[in-house]
């Protein structure tokens, strides 16, 4: 029976590759080259030029490192010294010398070296590893190994500046990525729940009609509790409506999953077409999603075999259709997943640009997918590595739970009277003055800190070194702290936050969002201003929680109920708005004392509103439910 299954699997693989070669010759080429590619990033492997991309080293191959040799030699010396001081019987036991002379007076004339004392099983493991290497399996380039095991290596970080070596982590544009994909191949566009809808690049519809693209929201564990089916259905219904009314994407082409928690993997397996290319923004979770599909399929086979084994262990040969797994089975499963994940691609990392070429992924010979490098529209995206160390990047891009930190029951902080909110030093949000008050809920990994005003922030950044007591609020590298001086005036970008009425989310790409709720009576039309590092992008949107756990519909004056957030016509009102780019005064003396009227003028000019018209934004305009979206632009 087992040989028959193996034969059927081989036949299905051969037929699949044959048909793919007929329909998509480019896909067939990727399959042929997959054995000589890095399993993690997809780059073509080479072993001749260590300083060029794709260099790899075979397992067991020496580094010719003199430091390692000296360390090994010193270890041998200590080992031999200890061995000489042992009794003969203990010495024979230590070195497994069972053929040693039995007489105590006989002495050992030579001491075996440390390399000779190796377990017998290691030879078999080495042989198996060599066989895997000869078959071209589980090979990774040096850069990928350094990211996983040695992140301080020069192939990852520039040793002179402790920042990202950008030549090893290229990030292409959308057009470059699509040029590597067959024009009629299925496309699966992955975007993150962490910064929705910023992960959807609308340029994709210039190359493919919306009816031919499948959309998958991943990292949904950040938004939706895994056990709450009602919340999942609510948000899925909203997302399908949004994608249909905003981009004309068929509702059945939209799916929600979580690669990290391997949530909805069985349904996702059937949702994604065979030979599909997985595309999306860099760091959106594409590789994690593909890897989770691969692991999920592997786990299903293992559970089936484990249950079969449990049935065979039952007394008196009793058979059962559902043999339960034991605790030791699940412990073994965790080890199996870790081992399988470390040996099978694609690789995953928090560093943008980790995937460098198309990575073919064969799921048990039944379905084949292609993990594609992520793209970006922000040319300054990698500049954040000039400011932060890699540990901080890994921390702030993980995201955090909406229901734990963003719900009405979550802890909030209060901002008032023109205070400035620091986003760990990579951004500063200036709030209006004149007795204004806001509730802030932090749904990011940023450590937020309140300053009295912008002058206080500026005075700290003007110092030669940030005080130790404040260092946790500025997560820049020590080497870069000196360079941060004057950057609010020059390097950081200034944005005007469009006017809003009610609660909003300030969304920061790849990071998360900050929920902002005005409290008390509105006394000023003064606008919020955001100073942001150029590598980051931000928008405002309607509160995402309203579409997961919507409030009960309110009754109108005539007694009818308002439509809920989920069933409302999302096409008639903007769901989000871009921020308004603003000029930073070149004169330092006028920088901290810019008037609100200057921001009003820039807002009206950007939206092409005549300042003499009634709709022009100014101090006398009344903002309410009827016009609260008039100054939003998608």
Swiss-Prot record:
Top-level taxon of the source organism: Eukaryota
PROSITE patterns: G_CP
GO cellular component: mitochondrion
Cell location: Mitochondrion
GO terms, molecular function: GTP binding
All residue ranges annotated as the CP-type G domain in the record: 171-378
Transit peptide: 1-40
Keywords: Mitochondrion, Transit peptide
The family this protein is said to belong to: Belongs to the TRAFAC class YlqF/YawG GTPase family. GEP3 subfamily.
Function: May be involved in the mitochondrial lipid metabolism.
Protein name listed in UniProt: Genetic interactor of prohibitins 3, mitochondrial
Organism: Candida dubliniensis (strain CD36 / ATCC MYA-646 / CBS 7987 / NCPF 3949 / NRRL Y-17841)
